[in-house]
Amino acid sequence: EAGCQEALFTLGDKPELRYTQARHELERLGYETTIQYLVAAAEAVRDATGLLPHANPGVVSRDELLALRAVCPSQGMMLESVSRRLLEKGNAHYGSPDKDPEVRLETMRWAGELRVPYTSGILIGIGETREERIESLLALRDLHDQYGHLQEIIIQNFRAKEGTAMAQWAEPSLDELLWTIAAARLMFGPRMAIQAPPNLSPDTFGALIQAGINDWGGVSPVTPDHVNPEAPWPHLDLLAKETEAAG
């Protein structure tokens, strides 16, 4: 009734390896891994609703990509950044082995080899330089040039969240976001879908379009953004009006 076509499944990397409660819940439900449960959930939603599942479960193996491919028309994972400097102590990716860019790029490479339609992108404002953003976009472009499987590039601006280690971290400016969108458009050309989450940059829709986006991404009139619950989705009518005004 709301016109939705896709169901997004987004989650952390293999929570059962870190949290006892996650392991116990999987055992109670009759699954050995989170990915097995995700495959079953995606299949159930697809069959019951007709919505197309999009899986974003983080770093996965080739076999897990194949299992998800059977029930999900598309998959995805943010590269975030190729900067290994961010893995060092005191930086954004310290203590997060699944944020290692080589590990993430390997999963994306397998997705290309397996012809899995894939969404990726970068996260800006986490301590990276402009040069490192370009290097990250180049890594994604190289993958796409080889496999042709990237269907969308996301330029996402960091938003500080209470209760996290980066709660006091300064958020990137609008100028930095627009610069990065423009760089991505120049690098990927006119055919690539490039998006920036509209709920993370309210009241700037025209500027985002002029910088180079041509896709608003997944915007739900039914559910909140569970990753960024403090940032409500803009109304679809407003997005349509702003898009039309920008030509």
Predicted regions and their residues:
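Conserved Radical SAM active-site core
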Residues: 1-145
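Auxiliary Fe-S-binding modules of radical SAM enzymes
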Residues: 47-49, 112, 134-247
